[in-house]
């Protein structure tokens, strides 16, 4: 806190018997010119000093003892930084008292003193102006003109001093007022820069988001989508597998064929006889099947390995037109051949039977109907027929050599000329002619044309006679010819030259008992047989069907024998 003593005023009068107490040191301390010597006071003009006012401390008592006006002001600029300006105008009127003749000459002018006090603290009691008048009892000296001049000069000096100090103070405060707009401008600039930086950041963020979206779009547009269409090879494989599945699961007993109009040029026995077939231009053709087949019996149709497409027999005229015969071909496409030529067969284990069928249901019906003598008991069967057959694997390429050695014969040649069936090498295969040297004329010869191959559909329960596969004697257990028959539907070809038929119905019935050769599939190779499952010793073979009490538990439950392990 800075305190200044603003003014000290000397007394305008003089006291009797002495001069005023030295105000020169105080004025000199304030930088004011020292007042001149005051004249001596009149002996009768002295008055006692007034007592100090109430509530004043020692400072007021000291001020009262001195004949001057003390004005004290205090300012606090460091703590508050701002203050209130208050101008106080103090009017001091002093009326001299003394001799009567001096009162007329010594009229005192009113003196006006301007004092500026800056008060920075409202709570400070010392920052108040205190006016200490000289009092009415004081007498002025006798020389009024001189004192008035001195008082006027002192007043002017004080006024100029106060004005100069105010000007300095205002000049020191002006830079702060000038700096305030600059600070505001700087704040505005910083705010603008912040705004611009925020805008730039937002633009960068939006640009980055746009770039990311563009990148995503580019990546998604460049994804290689695999083609939805399958290749031709895959489609072919799908067709092949579908054909295989349909072939294995189908239960239709008949081969579909368009209605065939029998040729009127043929004899009646040829029309009404067993279904016949003829080979012409590499295709096997056949007529509609007779009533020998039972449509209700489930059996798969001709598989891809069994037959080529059949067509109806062409007229025996020499002027046959191939275009007319081609119209009778089946609408079904040529089935593809399966890669796997192995097929599971079921062999009858009854003594001196050895029948082989391609379905378990067929072999069971065969055993029930032929060997056990049970007809129509398939639903109520006790499962005894399961012990009389076993599974074998047969290669369907076994009949390759059989058809390769057979030359196709046209119907006109077969009707007009002698039998044209070639006899293959006996060292390589067994032919029907080699086996039928002792019996050239059989009941079958009455029911077939000269060299045409009879084709008939047969099923398991009809006990189709054994079919001889050429060159298969080495695979049979007893050294005799190994005979198999197919259920889908077995087709019997007889290559024995015979005379025209006389008894078609009887011959067709006897055909099932005396046929010698059956070729059921296009030839592709040799026969390879897996070791049959039932060839080893088993409880039912060792002890027989009569002694089931001696069988092992596995055999009782129709499982693999655990007592006689292969």
Swiss-Prot record:
Residue stretches of biased makeup (Acidic residues): 101-128
GO terms classed as biological process: regulation of transcription by RNA polymerase II
UniProt zinc finger (C2H2-type) residues: 346-371
Sequence motif: CR1, positions: 537-541
Annotated region (Sufficient for binding to RE2 sequence motifs), positions in chain: 471-566
Motif (CR2): 555-559
UniProtKB keywords: DNA-binding, Metal-binding, Nucleus, Phosphoprotein, Transcription, Transcription regulation, Zinc, Zinc-finger
Name this protein carries in UniProt: Zinc finger protein 704
Origin species: Mus musculus (Mouse)
Gene this chain is encoded by: Znf704
């Amino acid at each position: 806190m800075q305190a200044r003593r603003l003014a000290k005023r000397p007394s305008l009068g003089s006291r009797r018997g002495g001069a005023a107490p030295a105000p020169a040191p105080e004025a000199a301390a304030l930088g004011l010119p020292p007042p001149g010597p005051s004249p001596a006071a009149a002996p009768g003009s002295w008055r006692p000093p007034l007592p100090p006012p109430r509530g004043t401390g020692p400072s007021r008592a000291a001020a009262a003892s001195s004949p001057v006006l003390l004005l004290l002001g205090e300012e606090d600029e460091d703590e508050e930084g701002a203050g209130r300006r208050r101008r106080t105008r103090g009017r001091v009127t002093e009326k001299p008292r003394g001799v009567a003749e001096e009162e007329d000459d010594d009229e005192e002018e009113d003196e006006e003193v301007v004092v500026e006090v800056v008060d920075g603290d409202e709570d400070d009691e010392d920052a108040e102006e205190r006016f200490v008048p000289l009092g009415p009892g004081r007498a002025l000296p006798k020389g009024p003109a001189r004192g008035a001049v001195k008082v006027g000069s002192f007043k002017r000096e004080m006024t100029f001093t106060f004005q100069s100090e105010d000007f300095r103070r205002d000049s020191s405060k002006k830079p702060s007022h000038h700096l305030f707009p600059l600070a505001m401008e700087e704040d505005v600039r910083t705010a603008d820069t912040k705004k611009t930086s925020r805008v730039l950041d937002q633009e960068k963020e939006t640009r980055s988001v746009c770039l990311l979206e563009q990148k995503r779009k580019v990546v998604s547009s460049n994804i290689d989508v695999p083609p939805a269409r399958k290749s031709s090879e895959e489609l072919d494989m799908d067709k092949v597998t579908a054909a295989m599945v349909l072939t294995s699961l189908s239960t239709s007993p008949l081969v579909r064929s368009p209605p065939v109009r029998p040729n009127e040029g043929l004899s009646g026995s040829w029309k009404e006889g067993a279904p016949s077939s003829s080979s012409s231009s590499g295709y096997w053709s056949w007529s509609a099947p007779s009533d020998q087949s039972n449509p209700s019996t489930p059996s798969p149709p001709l598989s891809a390995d069994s037959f080529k497409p059949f067509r109806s027999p062409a007229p025996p005229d020499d002027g046959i037109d191939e275009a007319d015969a081609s119209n009778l071909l089946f609408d079904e496409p040529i089935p593809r051949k399966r890669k796997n030529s192995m097929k599971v067969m079921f062999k009858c284990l009854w003594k001196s039977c050895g029948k082989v069928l391609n379905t378990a249901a067929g072999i069971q019906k065969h055993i029930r109907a032929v060997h056990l003598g049970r007809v129509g008991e398939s639903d109520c069967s006790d499962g005894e027929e399961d012990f009389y057959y076993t599974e074998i694997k047969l290669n369907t390429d076994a009949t390759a050599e059989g058809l390769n050695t057979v030359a196709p014969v046209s119907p006109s040649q077969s009707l007009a000329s002698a039998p044209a069936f070639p006899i293959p090498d006996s060292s390589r295969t067994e032919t029907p002619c080699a086996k039928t040297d002792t019996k050239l004329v059989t009941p079958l010869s009455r029911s077939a044309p000269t060299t045409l191959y009879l084709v008939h559909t047969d099923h398991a329960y009809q006990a189709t006679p054994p079919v001889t596969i050429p060159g298969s004697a080495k695979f049979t257990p007893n050294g005799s010819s190994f005979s198999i028959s197919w259920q889908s539907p077995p087709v019997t070809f007889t290559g024995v030259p015979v005379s025209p038929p006389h008894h078609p119905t009887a011959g067709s019935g006897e055909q099932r008992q005396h046929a010698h050769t059956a070729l059921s599939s296009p030839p592709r190779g040799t026969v390879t047989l897996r070791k049959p499952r039932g060839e080893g010793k088993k409880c039912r073979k060792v002890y027989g069907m009569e002694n089931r009490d001696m069988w092992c538990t596995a055999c009782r439950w129709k499982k693999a024998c655990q007592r006689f392990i292969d």
